[in-house]
C-alpha cells in the first residue's frame, strides 16, 4: 500500500519542477556561435550572439584563453584582429591573414550568474604548393618505360595528386602522405609508369594537385617528353599524273625522330643506285617512256631505315592543247567571225546593186553628151506604160 501512495507525490514534484526545466532548456542568456573554415592567408569572421544579455558584455578569447575583445574594447594588441560589430546582443570580430597557428577553439563568454560560454572551432586550410615532377632525364626510345615522380608540400589536410597525358588520364600509384616538420601540413607524392610510343613524342605529362583550399583552381606542372623512333617514308609525285615530255619530281617524305638525314633512290632492275643525297627529291627533267618502272626510296636516320616504293607509269603526251595553242585558236576564231560578217555584208550589197541596176544606168546617161536623147528615151519609156502595144524606140 505504501508504493501506490507515493506515486501522486512524485507526479506533484515533477509538475512543480517542469517550469524550471523549461527555462533551462530555453536559456535566453546562452550565447551561440558557429564553426568556421578559412584558407591560410584569408580572413575569418567570428560572430557571437545572445538574446538576453542581462546587462553584461560579450567577450571573445583565443585558444590560448587570451582575451581578444571585451565588448568594443580591444584587449590584445594584434592589428590582424578588428572589431566588426559590438551591440548588447552581438559581438563580431575579424582575423585577417590567418595563419595555421590561428587554428583552434575560440570562446565567446558572457559574464552572467553563472558565466555562460560558446565555442567556435576555426579550421585553417593549408594551401598545397605547385607540384614538382622529377624522374625524366633524357629522350626515350620507342617501347621503353617512362617513370615520373610528382610531389607537393604544404597542404592541410593532405592533398591528392592525379596524372594525365594530354587529355588522357594516367593511373599512377596511390598518393603517399608524409607530415611536414611543422606538424600541421603534409607533403604528398605519387609516381606513374607507362610504355612510350611514337605518338607520345612531344606529349605533355601533367601532374595536378586537388585540394579544397584551391576552390576548383588548377594547380599543376607538366613535363614534355621526347621519344626516338625509326623513320617512315612515302613517295609523292609532282605532277600526280605525269606524261611523256613533262618534268617530274618524286618527293620522298621521311618522318621520324630524329628526322631522316639520308635518302637513297633505286630503280628495280638497274644498278647502281640512282641517287644518294641529303635531299629527298628525285628529278626527271624530261620524262621518257623508258623512265616507267618501280622506284624505291630508303630514308635513313641513326634509329634505322625505311624503304618506300612507287610505280611510275609514263603516259602519252597530253592531248590537251597548250596555252599558246589555245591563244592561237581564240585569235583564229575571231578572224573567222570577222570574215563571216564581211561575206554577209558583200552578199547584201550585191543583192542591193542588182535590184537597182536600171536606175543607176539611167542617172549615168544623164551626165553624158547625148543627154537630150537620153531625156527623150526616158519620156518615151514613161509613155510606154500607157501606150498599149505600140512599138517604141529608145535611145540610150
From Swiss-Prot:
Keywords: Calcium, Cell adhesion, Cell junction, Cell membrane, Disulfide bond, Glycoprotein, Immunoglobulin domain, Membrane, Phosphoprotein, Repeat, Signal, Transmembrane, Transmembrane helix. Residues 23-124 form the Ig-like V-type domain. It holds the Pfam family V-set. Residues 128-226, 231-313 form the Ig-like C2-type domain. Residues 23-328 are extracellular. Residues 1-22 form the signal peptide. GO terms for molecular function: protein homodimerization activity. Glycans are attached at residue 288. Belongs to the nectin family. This is Cell adhesion molecule 3. It comes from Mus musculus.
